Design a protein with these regions (language model features):
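Hydrophobic alpha-helical transmembrane signal-anchor segments
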Residues: 4-38
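Beta-lactam-recognizing serine transpeptidase/beta-lactamase-like catalytic domain environment
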Residues: 7, 69, 238-253, 257, ...
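Short, basic/aromatic recognition patches
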Residues: 40-53, 270-285
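Juxtamembrane extramembrane loops of integral membrane proteins
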Residues: 51, 55-100
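Envelope-exposed proteins and targeting segments
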Residues: 54-57, 73-77, 91, 124-126, ...
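Solvent-exposed, polar/charged alpha-helical surfaces in well-ordered, non-transmembrane soluble domains
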Residues: 75, 89-93, 97, 108, ...
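Small/polar-residue-rich segments within soluble enzyme cores
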Residues: 91-97, 114-258, 575, 592-595
Length: 641
């Protein structure tokens, strides 16, 4: 009986063992045969990675080779909590200052943590990101600190395994990602912010591969992004369980091609001069904004383009969109009296008038098309030249009427209004020039004084440059050339002539008229320079109210645009103030800023003086007659005094 029971037990044990071995065998067959390919691919995916190798983004430099934007490669500092063991406090205390983190925060990140993987298994996290964008110099300090880190034990008395723990802790516990990140740096901060723009992180696809890297978001960074960005590389390799590359298992390694460097026409010294003068204007007059553009009339080269308020492209998100907007190309305003140069140029070029021709300005009260236009002074008979000198609204209107709508419209568009200038910056608008069919009977008397038309500050500057450049309109030139990393010129950008708007003879006549604006009898006496003749025009435009017919009381856009030396211009300088306080006439608030910039710019560029100093002009601070915005009957919805 006992033998029978023992036999049954042995039989049951044999059956159980057989079933166990059968299950194990099936599992082995399932893993090694039936699902071998599937599991092999999954294992390969778990280990194999494709690493993006970002090319070095090209530098941006000014015309003198000064660095405006550059890129540095930075580390991502990581930790393996397993190798740190129970030394979190010691490690945190040692490297927290280098990472600019609190010890408590870093201590928490170094703690050992577990998680559930896809199979439901508990795994330990051996890859913890501590800090991104760590400069290479800082990373080296961290490595040196870890290598010399004391732990308060006599390591000579440690066992082999204990000594190995401390060795791995020093050498491997804190590590960096295998591929560095790229950080865009703007050394001069806000100096050229609205020209340079800034970058952000964007995804792009090359050869079927999708990469995420820095990309231009605004300004030159956006417009020249394809040239600056370069071509990414990639690396197909395998990593260990701490996401560190196993170099011997690399399958592909394609080198990136660095981006090109861009050399701008901007001169940092000129830009600084303009920006300092604008900052002073902001302090004195508290305008909503202040802008300045400095151009070489003969070539269209932009030497300075500044707008305040501005922003630091190293941290563009610190300010709102309003401060990041490039008002020189994005904002449109009624230009006011600066637009009188267009109607007078057109009339002279068409032979409709001469500078000596006279018009009756009717003591400052002119009725036309059922409305009344006023001058700021009760002028009687004025010559065409004096109409420019005194900035007479009635005189400009009568010249426009004599010229006619078709001719005026043609010259407006020929001077570039209603079209983008083509400057390589994002966000430029075309302004507003209404087609002839939409003009009212009143338009021909209002457009000559800068009403019923909206322009960008840059359009107005380039129109003045055309007069200074013997009647030839140029395209703004902002990028001088592209170079490779070795300094070889890849592309050279030449000045571009748009069209001959007026004849050279007409341009010379306009220069003579515009010189008188800066005389003691003109509206911009405060723009006069001691050693140089200046030609220019003031503007004081009453601002419209968005969505409301008419103009905003007490809100003005003040302008002065001038060039020097007047007969052989090297520089055209424009200053714009939006809603200045404590004075608003262009000759009163913008002209002195022009003078300050022009004096420093002429000295810096060693421009040859064209006049002998005159004691009466030295330190001239006397204001000449100030032009005022046109006044019409309030029922018209146009500007009033």
């Amino acid at each position: 009986m006992a033998k029978k029971i023992q036999f049954r037990r042995l039989l049951m044990l044999a059956i159980l063992l057989g079933l166990a071995f059968a299950g194990l065998g099936y599992r082995l067959v399932d893993l090694q045969v039936l699902r071998h390919e599937e599991l092999g691919e999954k294992a390969q995916r778990n280990r194999q990675v494709e690493l993006f190798r970002e090319p070095r983004r090209g530098d941006i430099l000014d015309i003198k080779g000064n660095l405006l934007a550059t890129s540095i490669f930075v580390k991502t500092a990581c930790a393996d909590p397993v190798l740190i063991g129970n030394q979190q406090a010691t490690v945190a205390r040692a490297i927290a200052p280098w990472l600019q983190m609190g010890e408590g925060e870093l201590y928490q990140r170094l703690l050992l943590r577990t998680r559930q993987n896809e199979s439901g298994q508990t795994v330990t996290n051996r890859y913890v990101v501590l800090k991104r964008k760590v400069p290479a110099e800082t990373w080296q300090k961290i490595r040196e600190t870890m290598a010399q880190l004391p732990f308060g034990v006599d390591e000579k008395k440690l066992s082999r395994s204990e000594a190995g723990f401390y060795r791995d802790l020093r050498q491997k516990a804190i590590f960096a990602d295998p591929i560095d990140d790229q950080l865009r740096v703007y050394p001069n901060q806000a100096l050229v912010a609205h020209v340079l723009g800034y970058v952000g992180m964007n995804e792009r696809e090359i050869n079927g591969r999708r990469f995420t890297g820095i990309s231009g978001t605004d300004g030159i960074e956006l417009i020249l992004n394809a040239k600056l960005a370069g071509v990414p590389g990639w690396r197909v390799t395998e990593t260990d369980n701490r996401r560190r590359e196993v170099v011997d298992l690399r399958e592909q390694d394609v080198d990136p091609h660095d981006g090109l460097n861009a050399v701008l026409t901007i001169d940092s010294v000129m830009q600084h001069t303009a920006r300092v003068a604008l900052a002073d204007a902001m302090a004195r007059h508290s305008p909503l904004s202040a802008s300045c553009v400095v151009v070489r009339p003969r070539t269209g080269e932009i030497l300075a383009l500044a707008t305040l308020p501005d922003f630091d492209p190293n941290n563009p998100g610190a300010v709102g969109l309003d401060a990041r907007r490039n008002r020189v190309i994005c904002d449109v305003v009624e230009p006011g009296s600066t637009f009188k140069i267009i109607v007078v140029s057109a009339a002279l070029n068409e032979g409709v008038v001469t500078l000596a021709d006279v018009f009756d300005c009717e003591k400052g009260h002119f009725a036309y098309a059922g409305k009344v236009l006023h001058d700021h002074e009760p002028y009687g008979v004025l010559s065409v030249e004096s109409i420019i000198t005194k900035s007479s609204n009635i005189g400009a209107a009568k010249i426009g009427i004599k010229l006619g709508p078709s001719a005026l419209y043609r010259y407006m568009t020929d001077f570039g209004f209603g079209s983008r200038t083509g400057i390589p910056l994002a966000g430029e608008v075309a302004g507003i020039v209404h087609p002839l069919k939409n003009w009212s009977k009143l338009s021909i008397s209002r457009i000559p004084m800068g009403h019923e038309v909206a322009v960008t500050p840059l359009q107005m500057v380039m129109a003045m440059c055309a007069i200074a450049n013997r009647g030839c309109l140029m395209r703004p030139l902002l990028v001088d050339r592209l170079e490779d990393r070795k300094g070889n010129v890849v592309a050279q950008y030449q000045p571009q002539r748009v069209r001959q708007v007026i004849s050279e003879a007409t341009a010379r006549q306009m220069v003579e008229a515009l010189k008188t604006v800066v005389s003691p009898e003109g509206t911009a006496a405060q723009a006069a320079l001691e050693h140089y003749t200046v030609a220019g025009k003031t503007g004081t435009a009453q601002k419209t109210v968005e969505g409301v017919r008419g103009y905003a009381p007490g809100k003005y856009f003040s302008t002065f645009i001038g060039f020097l030396p007047a007969d052989n211009p090297e520089l055209c300088i424009a200053v714009f103030l939006d809603e200045p306080k404590g004075g608003y006439y262009g000759g009163q608030v913008a002209a002195p800023i022009f003078k300050r910039i022009a004096e420093r710019a002429a000295n810096y560029m060693n421009i040859q003086p064209d006049v002998e100093p005159q004691p009466a002009l030295a330190g001239n601070a006397a204001a000449g007659p100030a032009e005022r915005p046109g006044r019409v009957a309030s029922t018209t919805g146009e500007a009033t005094d």
